[in-house]
Structures are given as C-alpha cells and as structure tokens.
C-alpha cells in the first residue's frame, strides 16, 4: 500500500483544479478516493475505469487538467468523487438534471431540552427522487447493480457513490442539533460559529470539513494517504469491528454517535449563533475547548480512512 501511494506521489507534480466543496473539502474527498482506489481489485479497477469513460462529461470534467504523467483511470476516479459538488454550479450544463442538494446529508436530530427535530424518512420508494443521503445511497446501489441501467447513468451513479460514502463519514452530514438556541436546527453545524486556537472564527461545519487537511495538491494527498494507511491504529485489522458493519444505515448511525459525543460534545460545545446575514462574523465567539482540535483531527482522520476502506469494499463487491 505504502509503495503504491508513493508511486502516485513520485509521478505527479501537479495540483487538482480548484473546486467548491460542501462536505469534506476537496482534499478530504480525494483522500477517501485515493485510499479506496489503491484497494480495488484489478477487475474492479478495470471495470470502474471503463465505466467512467461512459460518463457524459468524461473528457470535459473527469479528465479536466489531467497531466500527461498521471494515469487517466486514477485521475478520473479521484475527480469523480468530487463531481457531485462540481455539478452544483449554476453554470454547469448538467446542473438542472444531476444536482441533487438533498442527497448530500441526512439530518437525524440531536435534541436538547424541549426542542425536537423531525426524524428523516429512511426508506426510498423506487420511482421517486430520494429525499436524503440514506435514500440516495439505496437508489445508487440499486442502479449500479441493475443490468437495465445504461452505462452513462451508472457512471454518474458511481460519482455519487464515491461522494456520498465520503459525505456520510463527515459527522455533520448525519445530524443537526435542536435546542432553545436552535429551535429550527443548526443545519448540520452551519448555524454555529466557533473560534479555533489559531485562525479566524468559522462555522462548525466548515471547521470539520477541513479537519484533516486543506492541501488538495495530489502530492500532498498521496503523502497523507500513505501516512494514514500506514498507521497501525488505522489498519483494516484495527478497524475490523467497524468494518464488520456493512449496512449504510449502520455507517450513518456511527457518524451520528460521533457527532453527538465528539462534534457537539454532548451539547456542551461553546459557540455563537451565526447571523442571518451570510458572511458576517459575530463578536466575542468563545474559543474551542482545550483538546477539542486534537480530538477533531484524530476523529476526522479515522472517518476518512473508514470511508476509503468501505468505498473499496462496495466497489469490489459490485465488480467481482
């Protein structure tokens, strides 16, 4: 594994194109996808490479800015994992048909005091558009295993599979806090402003998006992926209990538990309420508690690695 990732690092001296990210930042999604790609079987790697070539935006999006010395299959796979964020742009020609904003999250309520948020609908009804991440994953898995679905549609679904497995391992994509301060919910941390030890105040969701790294250059991503997968505490053996749970709902509930206990600190996390005016930062934002940032970094690294292993397992199972 370490040699494979090092080879990627040696071959590449370029950066990924800049992208807007809405879950893990671009680097986080690339970490998930690179860890997964290195664990694909030869048959699965060949299959996904052929499938992604059927993507209607293969040349214009998935191979955009690909340097000559980087394998097209690897590059397309990594960019595919960020494509559901790319297609959110109003300027993208497929925005109207392939942008599904509600697919990126499923907010199970974390209720404090008398506040009570709605419980999301878990079951997807075939023939309907999924209402949340959990329903979207059911549809995506069904489509990828359905011989009647056209390859170009499956290629788009593969992009979503990569992306949503990354998303659901970001704890704030599985929960929203409801309390006297947030009677309508904190929108997965977007309504809370926190103050890191170093840097400017940011909303809680953005803080967790960037908890692993903000460097999205491929050499940096490859180096960090090698570091993470070489960590004995993040090996498949060390994570075997979590990896024994193969159901997407289990993964979501795992993230939800992490969100309650570590992200929200069981409801004790100090923060300020985000003003209604976008981009305005309130005065006097309380600092994050001692040890919070170290806990966040350690937790986020673990979530990234689990997502990578699980994505590989999903794809290997489909393309045996």
Regions found by a protein language model. Give the residues of each.
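Positively charged n-region of N-terminal signal peptides that target proteins for export
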Residues: 1-4
């Amino acid at each position: 594994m370490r040699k494979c990732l090092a080879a990627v690092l040696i071959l590449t001296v370029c950066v990924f194109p800049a992208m807007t990210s809405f879950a893990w930042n671009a680097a986080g999604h690339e970490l998930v996808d690179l860890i997964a790609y290195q664990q694909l079987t030869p048959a699965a790697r060949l299959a996904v490479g052929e499938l992604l070539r059927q993507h209607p935006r293969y040349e214009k999006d998935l191979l955009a800015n690909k340097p000559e010395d980087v394998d097209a299959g690897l590059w397309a796979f990594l960019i595919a994992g960020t494509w559901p964020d790319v297609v959110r742009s109003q300027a993208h020609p497929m925005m109207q048909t392939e942008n599904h904003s509600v697919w990126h999250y499923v907010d199970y309520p974390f209720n404090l005091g008398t506040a009570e948020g709605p419980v999301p609908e878990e079951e997807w009804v075939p023939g309907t558009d999924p209402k949340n991440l959990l329903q979207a994953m059911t549809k995506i898995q069904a489509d990828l295993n359905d011989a009647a679905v056209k390859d170009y549609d499956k290629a788009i679904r593969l992009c979503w599979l990569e992306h949503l497995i990354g998303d659901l391992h970001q704890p704030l994509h599985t929960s929203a806090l409801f309390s006297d301060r947030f009677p309508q919910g904190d929108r997965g941390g977007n309504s809370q402003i926190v103050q890191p030890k170093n840097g400017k105040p940011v909303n809680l969701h953005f803080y967790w998006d960037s908890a692993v790294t903000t460097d999205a250059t491929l050499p940096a991503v490859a180096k960090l992926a090698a570091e993470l997968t070489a960590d004995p505490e993040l090996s498949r053996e060390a994570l075997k209990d979590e990896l024994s749970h193969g159901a997407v709902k289990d993964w979501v509930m795992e993230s939800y538990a992490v969100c309650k206990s570590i992200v929200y600190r069981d409801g004790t996390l100090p923060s300020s309420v985000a003003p209604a005016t976008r981009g305005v930062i309130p005065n006097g934002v309380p600092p994050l508690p001692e040890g919070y940032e170290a806990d966040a970094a350690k937790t986020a690294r673990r979530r990234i690695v689990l997502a990578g292993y699980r994505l590989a397992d999903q794809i290997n199972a489909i393309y045996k």
